[in-house]
A protein has these predicted regions:
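Glycine-rich tight-turn/loop motif centered on a GG-T
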Residues: 31-33, 63-72, 126-135, 194-203
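Hydrophobic residues within beta-strands of alpha/beta enzymes
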Residues: 56-58, 90, 115-117, 182, ...
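N-terminal pre-triad scaffold of radical SAM enzymes
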Residues: 1-29, 45-57
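Active-site mouth loops of central-metabolism enzymes
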Residues: 13-14, 24-38, 91-100, 157-164, ...
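Fe-S ferredoxin-like electron-transfer domains
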Residues: 34-42, 54, 70
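Conserved radical SAM core fold
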Residues: 57-67, 97-99, 113-132, 151-153, ...
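Auxiliary Fe-S-binding modules of radical SAM enzymes
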Residues: 1-8, 42, 46-52, 76-87, ...
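Phosphate/pyrophosphate-binding betaalpha-module
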Residues: 92, 108-110, 114
Length: 243
């Protein structure tokens, strides 16, 4: 956290803290979400100004209860943040919008610096761990982002019981849809009620996956036990290769 703040970067959660989905690895509360707070955007702008941030990541819980999945809220956040802080770069980390292309277009039209959508897990166990999600829908979403002028980014965790071949297949799939930024991190079991950790990967294994991803054409890759989707976000968007 200190490393992020030192770099003028922070991540903000919008649209409440209750998710409409119940993934087996996630500790976010599941249930009926709260209504959208119309003042939230103003609070967000105020926080970014007070913290003097140079790079902001805006994310949300999944809001399947909203017609557009919250795309309009993301769009407004990007537009109003840019108007208030023209020099601040804005990345959005979005849900899948249930494959709603019109919803995604709202976010793309707002012209964030980058759009991130995390695949989270490999294909063979995706349906089991993310029963309300869909691997192909998420990949198609990233394909549509990759074909837009906005930078495309994704990430996933390892340690669920996947094979090396599963990991390489996911890297290949992401490369095939023009995803240019990638994060790979170690899954940590939030509570005993969640999916157990099957394996803790060695840093050398993460280094190998990182190099493979670069060979596949990714412009920036972060891979390591403590890496999460917003880690080194600003450096990643610059396209610098950090070893």
């Amino acid at each position: 956290m200190a490393e992020c703040f030192a770099g003028g970067t922070a991540t903000f959660l919008i649209m409440g803290n209750i998710c409409t989905r119940d993934c087996l690895y996630c500790n976010v509360e599941h249930g009926k979400p709260v209504s959208i707070d119309e003042k939230e955007i103003h609070h967000l702008i105020g926080a970014v100004q007070k913290m003097k941030l140079e790079y902001v990541v805006v994310t949300s819980v999944t809001r399947d209860d909203l017609p557009d999945g919250g795309a309009q809220v993301f769009s407004q956040c990007v537009s109003k943040l840019r108007k208030a802080l023209p020099a601040c770069k804005i990345e959005v980390l979005i849900p899948d919008f249930q494959g709603n292309q019109a919803a995604l277009e709202k976010v793309i039209a707002a012209k964030p610096y980058a759009i991130n959508h995390n695949m989270e897990v490999v294909k063979p166990i995706f349906a089991q761990l993310r029963p309300q999600g869909n691997y192909d829908i998420s990949l198609e979403l990233l394909k549509n982002i990759g074909s837009s002028p906005v930078i495309s980014k994704s990430g996933f965790m390892v340690g669920f019981g996947e094979s090396r071949e599963d990991i390489l297949q996911l890297i290949d799939n992401l490369a095939s849809v023009s995803c240019s930024r990638l994060t790979i991190g170690q899954y940590q079991q939030p509570t005993l009620k969640h999916w157990p950790v099957a394996k803790y990967y060695h840093p050398d294994e993460f280094a190998e996956f990182k190099e493979i991803a670069y060979q596949k054409g990714f412009q920036h890759v972060e891979a390591g036990p403590l890496v999460r989707s917003s880690y080194h976000a600003a450096k990643a968007i610059q396209g610098s290769r950090v070893k």
